[in-house]
Amino acid sequence: MEKKILEQLEFEKVKEQFWPYLQTEQGQLELDLLEPIANKDKIQAYFTELEEMAAIFVEHHHFALGGLSDVSESMQRLDLEADLSIQELLAVKKLLQVSAEVCRFYADLENVDLVALKALFEKIESFPSLQGSLQAINDAGFVEGFASPELESIRRQISNKEHASRQLLQDILKKQAAYLSESLIASRNGRSVLPVKNTYRHKVAGVVHDMSASGSTVYIEPRALVSLNEELTQLQTDERHEIGRILHELSEQLRPHSRSLRNNAWLLGHLDLVRAKYLYMQAKQATVPVISDDKSLQLLNARHPLIQNPVANDLHFANDLAVIVITGPNTGGKTIMLKTLGLAQVMAQSGLPILADKGSRVAVFNGIYADIGDEQSIEQSLSTFSSHMTHIVEILNQADSDSLILFDELGAGTDPQEGASLAMAILEQLRLTNIKTMATTHYPELKAYGIETAYVENASMAFDNVSLKPTYRFMQGVPGRSNAFDIARRLGLAEHIVKEAQAMTATDHDVNRIIEQLEQQTLESRKRLEHIKEVEQDNLKFNRAVKKLYNEFSHAKDKELEKAALEAREIVDIALAESDSILSQLHEKAELKPHEIIEAKHRLKQLAPEQSLSQNKVLKKAKKWRAPRVGDDIIVTAYGQRGTLLAQLKDKRWEAQVGLIKLTLKEDEFSLVKLKEEAQQPKKRAVKVVKKAATGKGPRARLDLRGKRYEEAMQELDAFIDQALLNNMSQVDIIHGIGTGVIREAVGKYLRRNKHVKSFGYAPQNAGGSGCTIANLG
């Protein structure tokens, strides 16, 4: 396709109108490279994709992909054995997340028959293992402590050192307060320092890091703090090195999959572009045209995409019609009509929807050529006529019967008689070689050519004789007529002068009268056609209303099913609460071992739905809807850490990737994140484990009950003790605070009646005092 016509038709500006509907950088890149093609099958495939995307939106009104960055350079760096940065890994993490979401979306897609898009969806791969590994980096770009045991250990040491440093500085701050210009801890060169009055600088031993502008204050790092800060600096260096090692390990995991990831990015970008085409089509009331088997075109209510509030026009370019000549004065809209045809054809051959009504038809041309506007070349010192003629010669040498040619003001810029003769000769050559051509001209001689010559048709732009303004209505089959006499008469020229002028051109006056009658007949035909179209639109609106009612009914039905599922869930929760009450009584008897009690509780939770609601179809549907799948993101309950499901094992057990570690989990040991029903389900009880640590006495854990209601605190405490017993923990810390003392007393009462608690008491004063209870288990 000739590049020049894309510039003349401002095709790049048309493509810019699709930008607001794109979500991915890959989709943007594909749009930027988009150009017209002459492969009919490929164009039809683009249109089929667009029609199938419309079908998807009927069922899923808010289908979206989410913003994706371009990862092509990152994949190239992986191929070159380079390690990715945190930002690059975040982009890959987002790509993996969107890939998994699109795979799940396609797996759940119903009531939509896909052919072209099916191949795209099915080629998208999900990588649950990689997705789980990249959970080690959160969305803010922070490498989580659970990314590796070494990083977690280093950060724990950093935290301890920082705490010790602050404590030491606070002690020095109190003792040396008299020597300080301000009672605060400052920072200089990455070190914690004290602002000491210059007159007392020798009273505070340490390293001077800075001095105030006035010289009255020096910033000293106390000697007692120097070694501690050096240890902290070394730990921070170790942290950076460990993060670098983790980034290297993550890059190594991604490296074998760089080609697949690059392919995923392209597939998602292409889906994004198809989605953008559909949204543009909806916003602009555009359509997917039919592709002709021959070279015929039919544009119904075609509009120019770059004009605000354009006038819609019909154009019929039959297969046996070679040339359309648009005659008439300037500023009537002839050039706009020419460009409207050109843009409709270029957009269609680029796989884009066109601004026209349904039923429009386009052809496929190997070449589209145009000579539009003033192409005068100052460098060649050519006149306007010479410039145009040079370009026309190039077009005539390149065009063939599979081409479309658009000429604006053919033959202009020279003697009118010679220009008209040249224009007719050029059009005749194109007619004889059967090359589809549309040309505009203001030469009246071409009207006769259009009437007398086979396979050539006249056309014009309508003019309002009352307002003396063009209407921009395209009148096919009607040559343009002169309005000079009417305009002169309405502007006040003496009637006898007008009549004398008309007498001088009596023949032309008769022709104009015939043309006027043709215009009137064309306008009446247009009105009848518009009435037919209005009836068709009413039918379409009725059809849409019926579909809308059906969809609303379907959605209402789904909401009722969801409501029933929630009610069923409440029944199950009540049953579970009653079972917890029974089991709490068993605790007091101490007849059962801890693991037997917990196992019995777990079995009761599993049996409750089947026993009480085994025949409830709504609940079955809800359970099926909430069932975990490979690739789902999860939260591991015991650790509060994110991961990804890799594979389903036997007995409802799952293999999961958590950071760089693989775990085997039961379904009740994790919860799904980002489920649609998450906001609607009743919140499940969860134990808030604040911290795990190791002591000489064996494993221990800590539970924080501050701010909890009585019932919630007791439920969490019960589950926490169960978990501690299962994990063979010998000692646990329960933080309840002091407050009104209600929770503290309830904790003591619970521990006294639990036969598996050997002893308990308040923590030492420096570890929480009466706000924390330490319990020994056995």
UniProtKB/Swiss-Prot annotation:
InterPro entries in the record: DNA_mismatch_repair_MutS_C, DNA_mismatch_repair_MutS_core, DNA_mismatch_repair_MutS_sf, MSSS, MutS, MutS2, P-loop_NTPase, Smr_dom
Enzyme category, top tier: hydrolase
PROSITE patterns cross-referenced by the UniProt entry: DNA_MISMATCH_REPAIR_2, SMR
Occurrences of domain Smr (ranges): 703-778
Entry EC no(s): 3.1.-.-, 3.6.4.-
Gene3D superfamilies assigned to the protein according to its UniProt record, in alphabetical order: 3.30.1370.110, P-loop containing nucleotide triphosphate hydrolases (3.40.50.300)
Short name of one Pfam family: MSSS
Record flagged with keyword tRNA processing: no
Top-level taxon in the UniProt lineage: Bacteria
GO terms classed as biological process: mismatch repair; negative regulation of DNA recombination; rescue of stalled ribosome
Alphabetically ordered keywords of this record: ATP-binding, DNA-binding, Endonuclease, Hydrolase, Nuclease, Nucleotide-binding, RNA-binding, rRNA-binding
HAMAP family linked to this entry: MutS2
Family: Belongs to the DNA mismatch repair MutS family. MutS2 subfamily.
Protein name as annotated: Endonuclease MutS2
Organism of origin: Streptococcus equi subsp. equi (strain 4047)
